Amino acid sequence: MTEKQLDLFAGPMPVPATHSLDKQVLDAAALSDAELIAAIPEAGIGECHTLAREAARRRLAAAVLALKALCLRHTGFGGQRVVPQQAAALDALAAIGCREASRAIGDLIRRGAVEGPGLTLAVAAAAQLGSPLPEAIITNLLRHDDPQIRAAAARCAKPWPRTAPILIELLDDLHREVGMAAACALGQMGRAEARMPLLRALRDGPSEEIIDAAAGIGDEELIVLMGRTTTIRPDLTRTALEALETLDHPLAAKVATRIRAAEDCDSTRRRIPNP
């Protein structure tokens, strides 16, 4: 992605025309699905968030094309600041979260419909939904100046030939979030380069993403730490168990059995009334 040079002598950026709805229609909850969908593509600044949030609240998959159209209407206007209509549409697509929404976000990125701060929102949504993006675009995004975009792009990465070397470089990124996202992506690919960062992360700040990535490598030290995580973070017990069960390793089976036994003891203890 190439950054546009800022013209210090340029006038204010043009703003696309919008067609505000009559104020009495702004009760979005009162609109039918069809009325809501019809209103979204032409929504102005005043009503875009209200309409998009309502579509998200309803998990309205039928609104995906309308939300995408709202984003496309504002192509070219977000180089220096977030376009409210695009932000509203992207947030709604991420909340709706269906396959069509995932594809729509990927298509918006491929077509260059979002840029600047809006691209940050779009790539984060793509990572959240697993939007399909080609290797060439992910490779460019991994080199982006914005660390938030680099981190989100790492979460979108697949084991392509040109991607892994860039992710290995990003392990030493100055921004911790980027390095951790790169380590998780490499771990999912089974790359040994991610082993040490994932060991540190399991000790210092485990999460679902880190556990899943560690399972991609699954050596004995990582397996032991995945098991210990359940005593430090009981809320991650289910994630750790599921990850261990994917590993064809006798130690993983042993650790999983130990975790289940501890769960059974805790459950029994809770059922016994205090004297």
Task: Name each model-derived stretch.
Residues 2-10:
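Short linear clamp-binding motif
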Residues 9-28, 38, 42-61, 69, ...:
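Structural detector for internal amphipathic alpha-helices that build alpha-solenoid repeat scaffolds
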Residues 1-2, 275:
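Initiator methionine at the very start of the polypeptide chain
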